[in-house]
Amino acid sequence: MPDTVDNEDMFDLDRQPVNFKDVLIEMKDVSELMVDLAYSAILFESKEIAREVVNLEESMNRLLYQARITSILGARRLEEAESMSGLLQIAEGAERISNAASDIANVILKDIQIPIRMRRALPEAEEVTVRIEISESSELVNALLGEVRLQSTTGMRIIAIRRGRFWIYDPDKDTRLEKGDVLIAKGPEDGIDPLWRLAGRALPQIDPGIGQPVDNLDRAVLLIVEMKNVSELAVGLAYTALLFDSKDIAEEVFWLNERMDSMRLSLELWVLEEAKKIEPIESLRGLLHMAAFADAICSAASSIVDVIRRDIEIPPIFKKIIRESDEIISRIDVQAGSFLDGKTLKEASLGAVTGMIVLAIKRGEQWIYRPKKNARLYEGDTIIAKGRRDGECRLFSLSKAEQ
C-alpha cells in the first residue's frame, strides 16, 4: 500500500484525531473491521464490501500519518522517544493488517477466483460470518442496536447492514434496524441459532456432506481455515501480551507466526504438486492469496509484540487504548462456587451468553491457548477473552462465587 495520500487531506489536521491515544484506538478498530469485511467480501462474493475495504485503507493511511506526526511532536527526551517508538510500531502493525485486508479485497475486485469449497468452508472457522435478513415479524424491527445488545445476547457482532442498495458499515448503538435489513454478523458458531430466531427466520438446514470423500482440495481448504483461525488468535494474543506485559504470551505469538510460515509453505508446495490436476487452475491463485492474507496478519501480530522482546516500555496509555476500543481484552479469575467453576466452555456457552471469545486460560503457571469446547474451567483459572464491554460484565458475573 502506498504511504502517500492527498496532501490537502494530510495537512488538514483538524479532521484528524487530536492525540496519539485516539489515533491508535481508531487504527485498531478500523484494521479489525477491515479484516472482518474482507472475509465477508470473500464469503458473499461482494464487490461492494470489497470496495469499502479499499476505502478504509485510505483512512488508515491518514491515521498512520497522524500517528507519525504525533509521535515526533510528543517526544522531547530519549526515554519518551523510546516509548513513542513502541507505540508507533504498534500503529504500523495495525496498518500492516489493513494492508493485508486491502490486498484480499482487491482479489475480489479483480475477479480472481476463490474455490466455492473455500467459501463453503469459511463458516467452519472458529469465528463465523453469516448473512441474515430481518423478517417483518422480527422483534428487531425498529429496534436500536444498543437496545437489543445482540453481541451480549447471541454472541454475534453486526459488522455491516445492507438496506436496499445501500450499506451501513460498522453500525453503532444508535443504528435503528428495519424490516428487510440484511445483517452481516460475526461471532461463535453457537450464536447463529439465537440470531436467526431474533431475526424471525428459521435456521436453514445445511447439507453436512456426510459420506463424501475428502480430496486434496478439501485438505488445502481446511488448512487455510486453520490459517485464518491462527491469524485471528495471534492478533488477539498480541494485544493481550502488550496489555498485561506478558513475555509468555508474546512468545506464543512468535511461535504462532512460525507455525503460520510452515502452513503457508505446505500450501504452496501442494499447489505446485496439484497444478496440473485441478481445473480451472485459476482457482488455485485464490488459495494462494488467502494464505498470504492470513500469513500477513500473523506477521503483523508478531511485529506488534516485538516491542516486548526488545524490552521497550509500553506507556500506561496503551491500556486505555485497549479498554476504549470497540473490542476489548479482559482478564477474569474463576472463583470457587461460581457458575463457571467445573463447567466446560461448551456447557457454559460463553460465546452465546456473553459474546466473549476465549483466547486463553491460565492455570497455575501453565497456559492453554485457543482452548477447545471441551476445556473445563476450575477455581483459580484466569480467562483471557475478547469482546464488548457489556459482554465482559456478564462474564465477570458468571465467574463470581454464587451467593
Predicted segment positions?
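Cytosolic, long alpha-helical scaffolding segments
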Residues: 1-403
